[in-house]
Amino acid sequence: MAEKFIKHTGLVVPLDAANVDTDAIIPKQFLQKVTRTGFGAHLFNDWRFLDEKGQQPNPDFVLNFPQYQGASILLARENFGCGSSREHAPWALTDYGFKVVIAPSFADIFYGNSFNNQLLPVKLSDAEVDELFALVQANPGIHFDVDLEAQEVKAGEKTYRFTIDAFRRHCMMNGLDSIGLTLQHDDAIASYEEKQPAFMR
């Protein structure tokens, strides 16, 4: 069972770029592993580092700014997670420490993969995201409160409402991924299998 997501308060980092694709999130040369850990070191590798080996940080990239170290909420622009359908993208984001991504829109496959990996993708309007960028840029180090149960983001003096599909919301709040959902019916599955002829087992 995955970690339950109900509420999260975290430091916000503003990535002011639209159409951030999955190859930018986790470049293809780092996709050899099939486990979910270790990808955070290569998150935004071509932007975070000046060298291919990822040993020389790029001082001009926002994730490297001192005031955003330890950020767990990523604020982005429209069509986040576009490009190829690699599940490694949410793996890299969560392994780095992100719990929430806020953007006006997400690529469909990335959006679904995020829920499967307990990464909450929050959709707000363009105008609301503009407000949040202005707020973060005026208050570096600001924290947002994200409440999945209430479907609200509290930022500064304002509260922003978002909507999540009821089934996905239930799964995240109960720490259920695809395997967890199946295991909820373990007794019924076992009972069904016991009733099958021996040659079908």
From Swiss-Prot:
It comes from the Bacteria. One of its GO terms (cellular component) is 3-isopropylmalate dehydratase complex. GO terms for molecular function: 3-isopropylmalate dehydratase activity. It catalyses: (2R,3S)-3-isopropylmalate = (2S)-2-isopropylmalate. InterPro entries: 3-IsopropMal_deHydase_ssu, Aconitase/3IPM_dehydase_swvl, AconitaseA/IPMdHydase_ssu_swvl, IPMI_Swivel, LeuD. Signal peptide: none annotated. It is an enzyme of class 4 (lyase). GO terms for biological process: L-leucine biosynthetic process. Pathway: Amino-acid biosynthesis; L-leucine biosynthesis; L-leucine from 3-methyl-2-oxobutanoate: step 2/4. Its EC number is 4.2.1.33. The keyword Disulfide bond does not apply. Keywords: Amino-acid biosynthesis, Branched-chain amino acid biosynthesis, Leucine biosynthesis, Lyase. Pfam families: Aconitase_C (PF00694). Heterodimer of LeuC and LeuD. Catalyzes the isomerization between 2-isopropylmalate and 3-isopropylmalate, via the formation of 2-isopropylmaleate. NCBIfam families: leuD (TIGR00171), PRK01641.1 (NF002458). Belongs to the LeuD family. LeuD type 1 subfamily. PANTHER family: 3-ISOPROPYLMALATE DEHYDRATASE SMALL SUBUNIT, 3-ISOPROPYLMALATE DEHYDRATASE SMALL SUBUNIT 2-RELATED-RELATED. This is 3-isopropylmalate dehydratase small subunit.
